[in-house]
Amino acid sequence: MKPIVSILIFCALAVVIMGHPLDSGYGIPHIVEKLPNGQWCKTPGDDCSKNNECCKPKDPENYSSGCASQWSGMQGKRVNMCRICYIESSMC
C-alpha cells in the first residue's frame, strides 16, 4: 500500500511541476485581432500552420506565442496548435 501512495504522490507532483502536456495557455490573457487577410487570429489550442496566425499575449515581455507541434490523442498524430506560454518556463 505504501509504494502505491508514494507513486501517486510522485505523479501528482510531476503534473503540478511540469504542467499538463496539452496546456496551450488559453487562460493567459491574449489579444484577439483581425489579421491582414481578414480572418481573426487563432486562440491558444486552435490548429495553425504559421506563427503569425496565432493571437499574441497581452504581456509580450513575460509571455511568448506561436504555432507549435503537439501530440493529439484524438487524431493519433502530431498537429500544429497555437500556444502561449510563460517565457521563463522550461516548457516554453
Curated annotation (Swiss-Prot):
GO cellular component terms listed in the entry, alphabetical order: extracellular region
Care to name a GO molecular-function term for this sequence? toxin activity
- So which residues have sugars stuck on them? N62
* Tissue-level expression: Expressed by the venom gland.
Transmembrane intervals: none
The family database entries (InterPro entries) matched by this protein are listed as:
Cys_Knot_tox
Keywords of the record:
Disulfide bond, Glycoprotein, Ion channel impairing toxin, Knottin, Neurotoxin, Secreted, Signal, Toxin
Write the signal peptide boundaries: 1-19
Q: Which Pfam families match?
A: Cys_Knot_tox
Q: Where in the cell is it found?
A: Secreted
Name the cystine pairs.
C41-C55, C48-C67, C54-C82, C85-C92
Report if keyword Nucleus is assigned: no
Main location group: secreted
Domain notes for this protein? The presence of a 'disulfide through disulfide knot' structurally defines this protein as a knottin.
Q: What does this protein do?
A: Probable neurotoxin with ion channel impairing activity.
**Which family is it part of?**
Belongs to the neurotoxin 21 family.
What name goes with this protein? Toxin ICK-19
Q: What is the lineage of its organism?
A: Eukaryota, Metazoa, Ecdysozoa, Arthropoda, Chelicerata
